[in-house]
């Protein structure tokens, strides 16, 4: 956001409101100082005074109570890069991660409910609530305990250590392999919220223009499109997936992957009655009711018929069980053979490991909350009460190279990870590109699995698709231990700042990138571990740290 001079002296009430500006907003939108917060507060106060609602606005910001009064005002565009008034208010005092108007809704008690087509809005930041997306529901994994799954893997005490060590060793081996590159252009987080709004009839938030695309560039070897219009978005949303049940999935697959059926469940044939038996149009029902052959009392052998004389076959209720005692005995014996492994969610959903070239710097960091900021500043882990911030500038390395120091100085606002509807997205907040390697994203988009994607500034992309992962895990559980074990790679995402690697770069491996980190998704990785244990793999080897 642009700077503009702050007048002297400062109103004490403005200083009090500036203290309420969120720290993450000051970092990602401003210059990291309280002076920027004062500038934003003064700008918003001018808007409130212009519409004679400053007292109500001040009262709402200080008290932080939804019961405070409404602050009606025009949703005018502010000077500089502050955007619309309501977005600036919400970003400053309530939601530091808000990007679109479709991410919030007015509370029921607000007398000036927000509408993107209306000129007037309520500036009270506590008269809005965050739109909670429904979590992607996945079926449990069914494991047959009597199958031969081959030789089980050797698992160490920590599942993360297994793949962390293997990845670094294999990087040396596959350094000579070709790693494709692609440039990602588009906003998959916006597509996620636009799709949700379309499914729920919130068309006031929809943007009928182009949503963006994957654009081929001199450094990209693949070009993809995220969707060209709102019509194509709805078409993909309503398309049915004939291969498997249509469990709800938020987000939009690229054209290279199979589109899923949103918010619906396709029942199997055993649970349904044929349409011929179940449904009749109004005219047919009328013909039956007025037919002389229709009688509520079935005298003799007379049966109800249609008007043209065709007999009506009654639908008999199904018995609870149609199995013999022997069949029920087989079912009870099979209950001990098959076991379901449910997906479980833990608050600590993300683990970060920071590297400078091939050297791990610092310790692993666990992340809680629905989003995590990885920036280039110097805040320590103890400074973040919510454990949702990871500052690379805090870590020292006495053997740091000049190139690494230069890249660290360019990171700035960094990147942000989101956990939305059970799936993971990445947003680039830097002024420099970042390079992302995600097997899950590559599989979803139809890329080669080791493809490295260049994400330009302000870009977003989905790096973990829960529904796709569930399908792969369900298939692997019918094969071998190694097939299941290898899916841990889908739970790892690599992100490099400024310097990419692959066939279009001098660096053939991520180990030569100056500044990068690995993000491990704890919940899917734990699911893989639970399936392995259920399949009969030996328990993890305990060490002296146990």
Swiss-Prot record:
Pfam families: MH1, MH2. GO terms for cellular component: cytosol; heteromeric SMAD protein complex; nucleus. It comes from the Eukaryota. GO terms for biological process: activin receptor signaling pathway; anatomical structure morphogenesis; cell differentiation; dauer entry; dauer larval development; defense response to Gram-negative bacterium; determination of adult lifespan; egg-laying behavior. Signal peptide: none annotated. Expressed in the excretory cell and gonadal distal tip cells (DTCs). It is found in: Cytoplasm; Nucleus. Residues 234-268, 292-317 are annotated as: Disordered. Keywords: Cytoplasm, DNA-binding, Metal-binding, Nucleus, Transcription, Transcription regulation, Zinc. Residues 16-137 form the MH1 domain. GO terms for molecular function: DNA-binding transcription factor activity, RNA polymerase II-specific; I-SMAD binding; metal ion binding; RNA polymerase II cis-regulatory region sequence-specific DNA binding; RNA polymerase II-specific DNA-binding transcription factor binding. Residues 292-302 have a biased composition (Polar residues). Residues 349-546 form the MH2 domain. Belongs to the dwarfin/SMAD family. Probably a receptor-regulated SMAD (R-SMAD) that is an intracellular signal transducer and transcriptional modulator activated by TGF-beta-like daf-7 signaling. Plays a role in TGF-beta-like daf-7 signaling in regulating entry into a developmentally arrested larval state known as dauer, in response to harsh environmental conditions; partially redundant with R-SMAD daf-14. Plays a role in inhibiting mitosis and promoting a switch to meiosis in the germ line, perhaps by down-regulating lag-2 transcription in the gonadal distal tip cells (DTCs). Homodimer. Interacts with R-SMAD daf-14 and co-SMAD daf-3. Interacts with orphan nuclear receptor nhr-69. This is Smad protein daf-8. It comes from Caenorhabditis elegans.
């Amino acid at each position: 956001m642009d700077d503009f001079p702050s007048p002297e002296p400062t109103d004490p009430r403005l200083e009090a409101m500036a203290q309420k500006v969120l720290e993450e907003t000051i970092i990602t939108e401003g210059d990291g100082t309280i002076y920027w917060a004062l500038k934003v507060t003064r700008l918003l106060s001018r808007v409130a005074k212009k519409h004679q609602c400053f007292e109500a606005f001040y009262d709402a910001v200080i008290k932080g109570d939804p019961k405070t009064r409404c602050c009606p005002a025009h949703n005018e565009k502010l000077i500089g890069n502050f955007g619309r008034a309501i977005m600036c208010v919400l970003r400053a005092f309530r939601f530091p991660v808000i990007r679109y108007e479709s991410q919030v809704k007015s509370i029921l008690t607000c007398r000036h409910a927000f509408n993107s087509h209306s000129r007037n809005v309520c500036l009270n930041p506590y008269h809005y609530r965050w739109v909670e997306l429904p979590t992607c529901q996945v079926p449990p994994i069914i494991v047959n305990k009597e199958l031969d799954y081959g030789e089980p893997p050797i698992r160490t005490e920590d599942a993360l250590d297994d793949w962390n060590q293997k990845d670094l060793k294999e990087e040396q081996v596959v350094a000579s392999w070709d790693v494709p590159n692609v440039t990602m252009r588009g906003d998959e987080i916006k597509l996620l919220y636009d799709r949700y709004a379309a499914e729920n009839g919130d068309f006031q938030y929809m943007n009928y223009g182009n949503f963006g695309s994957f654009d081929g560039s001199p450094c990209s070897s693949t070009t993809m499109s995220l969707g060209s219009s709102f019509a194509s978005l709805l078409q993909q949303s309503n398309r049915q997936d004939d291969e498997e049940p249509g469990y709800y999935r938020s987000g939009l697959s690229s054209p290279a992957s199979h589109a899923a059926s949103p918010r619906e469940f396709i029942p199997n044939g055993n649970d349904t009655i044929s349409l011929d038996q179940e449904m009749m149009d109004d005219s047919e029902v009328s013909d039956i009711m007025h037919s002389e052959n229709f009688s509520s009392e079935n005298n003799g052998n007379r049966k109800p018929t249609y008007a043209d004389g065709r007999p009506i076959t009654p639908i008999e209720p199904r018995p609870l069980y149609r199995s013999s005692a022997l069949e029920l005995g087989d079912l009870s014996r099979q209950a001990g053979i098959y076991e379901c492994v449910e997906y479980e969610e833990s608050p600590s959903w993300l683990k970060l490991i920071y590297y400078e070239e091939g050297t791990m710097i610092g310790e692993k960091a666990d992340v809680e909350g629905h989003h995590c900021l990885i920036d280039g500043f110097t805040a320590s882990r103890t400074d973040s009460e919510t454990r949702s911030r990871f500052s690379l500038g805090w870590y020292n390395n006495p053997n740091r190279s000049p190139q690494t120091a230069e890249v660290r100085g360019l990171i700035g606002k960094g990147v942000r990870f989101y956990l939305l509807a059970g799936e993971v997205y990445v947003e680039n907040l830097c002024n420099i590109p970042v390079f992302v390697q995600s097997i899950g994203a590559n599989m979803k988009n139809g890329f080669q699995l080791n493809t490295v994607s260049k994400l330009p500034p302000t870009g977003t992309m989905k790096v973990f698709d829960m529904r796709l992962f569930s399908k792969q895990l369900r298939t692997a559980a019918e094969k071998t231990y190694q097939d299941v074990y290898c899916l841990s790679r889908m739970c790892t995402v690599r992100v490099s700042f400024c310097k990419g690697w692959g066939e279009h770069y001098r660096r053939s491996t991520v180990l030569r990138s100056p500044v990068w980190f690995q993000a491990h998704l704890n919940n899917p990785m734990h699911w893989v571990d639970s399936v392995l244990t259920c399949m009969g793999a030996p328990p993890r080897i305990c060490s002296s740290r146990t």
